A protein has these predicted regions:
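Short beta-strand elements in bilobed, periplasmic/extracellular small-molecule ligand-binding domains
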Residues: 77-89, 178-182, 200-221
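Hydrophobic alpha-helical
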Residues: 101, 105, 110-130, 199, ...
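Extracytoplasmic "Venus flytrap"
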Residues: 46-47, 51-97, 114-118, 184-194, ...
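Short, solvent-exposed amphipathic alpha-helices that sit
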Residues: 64-79, 158-165, 190-209, 227, ...
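Flexible loop/hinge segments that line or gate small-molecule binding clefts
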Residues: 119-157, 164, 168, 173-179, ...
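Hinge/cleft segment of the Venus flytrap/periplasmic-binding protein
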Residues: 8, 48, 183-187, 191, ...
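Hydrophobic alpha-helical segments within soluble ligand-binding/sensing domains
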Residues: 48, 52, 96, 151-178, ...
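Bacterial lipoprotein signal-peptidase II cleavage site
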Residues: 20-34, 38-41
Length: 375
């Protein structure tokens, strides 16, 4: 998928939402803004008024929550003059529930959550709905919940991009058939289910067999290394490719392969376009990652939250996704992901998501950056 298509699709989707926000502002600063502390941050509107609460999930599954989403959302609310309380649950369901109760008690008009699992997320949304609070599922759909809206990327498309990317890399490696391992995300995360739906279909459609298939609780990278090492040992290392559901899991796979002198010889996927993931792609130990332009996602979600907090309803031009647990359609805005290979890492830098200085940090990486036009 070209960078131009990504930009056009994201901008078109966002313009629909911004049009619904009337005179409210959804602008943000760049992702290089300083992240709030792990305890979260609060801001007050200059003129008082409604408040938006945001609960992010953790800091371990991905660096994005602290480094990107928190500052982007905070800057957007501040620019619009809307008070906000942005907190991180730190992967703790008890803390998540406590933050939910705290924000409901504060009288937030809108509550945006990234659930740790659907059960705890649904419990929070049920409490919020009872108080007339509008809720937004951000990035992850809460199955069985009461979300008023859902803003995310098309997560089946994310998985499809991974699967097709892995197929491309395996074929480039001269392997047109053979055994593939799947290292999936957390079994309690609906996104992980959708990612797998996409990449498993793409891999099977290309004629490969899936001979190992394991999920990683809580997206824990340490557990991922242990799980993949067991998979690798059981299969005697006989894999032609590994679909790892994100860059953190991919890094765990690469570490096991490196111990067996196979890093770069067996293609491995990832997702999130983290700095480490992009470096692995440049070095050839990871064949690809999936770039989800978090700024576009944060822009869309903050614009929606601002509109709702100001008493405005979005237009009916939003699409919808079906909650597989309740059968209900949830109004949704889904953005388009982009597959990133070594020759398109420069697109992520050009988009302002990261910088060459963060990626090109060693002699080997500087050489790779020069080779692939990362500057």
């Amino acid at each position: 998928m070209s960078k131009r298509y990504l930009a056009v699709a994201g901008a078109a989707a966002l313009s629909l939402l911004l049009a619904a926000c009337g005179s409210s502002s959804g602008g943000t600063t760049s992702s290089s803004a300083a992240a709030p502390s792990s305890s979260g941050s609060s801001s007050s509107a200059a003129g008082g008024g409604a408040k938006v609460g945001v609960i992010l999930p953790d800091t371990a599954s991905s660096a994005r929550w602290a480094n990107n989403d928190a500052p982007l959302l905070g800057d957007a609310f501040k620019a619009a003059g809307v008070a906000s309380d942005i907190q991180n649950a730190g992967g703790d369901k008890t803390k998540f529930a406590s933050l939910c109760d705290q924000m409901i008690g504060e009288g937030v008009a809108v509550l945006m959550i990234v659930n740790l699992d659907s059960d705890s997320g649904a419990a929070c949304e049920t409490k919020a709905a009872a108080q007339g609070i509008k809720t937004i599922d951000y990035d992850r759909l809460t199955l069985g919940g009461n979300a008023s809206y859902y803003v995310s990327f098309d997560n089946v498309a994310v998985g499809t991009a991974q699967g097709k990317g892995l197929v491309k890399c395996m074929q480039a490696n001269g392997k047109t058939t053979g055994p593939v391992a799947l290292l999936n995300g957390s079994p309690t995360d609906n996104n992980a289910t959708l990612f797998k739906q996409g990449y498993e279909a793409a891999i099977r459609a290309a004629g490969y067999s899936i001979t190992a298939d394991q999920s990683v609780p809580d997206w824990d990278n340490t557990k991922a290394g242990t799980i993949f090492e067991q998979m690798f040992t059981k299969a005697n290392g006989n894999f032609v490719g590994v679909d790892a559901a994100n860059d953190g899991l991919g890094g765990a796979v690469i570490a096991v392969l490196a111990k067996n002198k196979l890093a770069g010889k067996i293609p491995v996927t990832g997702q999130d376009a983290t700095d480490t993931g992009l470096q692995n792609v440049l070095l050839g130990t990871q064949c690809m990652t999936v770039y989800k332009a978090i700024k576009k996602e944060a822009d869309a979600a903050s614009a929606l939250a601002i509109s709702l907090a100001q008493g405005n309803a979005p237009t009916t031009q939003l699409g919808s996704v079906k909650d597989s647990k309740t059968g209900k359609d949830v109004p949704a805005l889904l953005l388009v992901p982009q597959a990133i290979f070594n020759d398109s890492v420069k697109d992520v830098v050009a988009d302002g998501f990261t910088t060459a200085a963060k990626l090109c940090t060693s002699a080997e990486l500087k050489a790779a950056c020069t080779k692939y036009g990362v500057s």
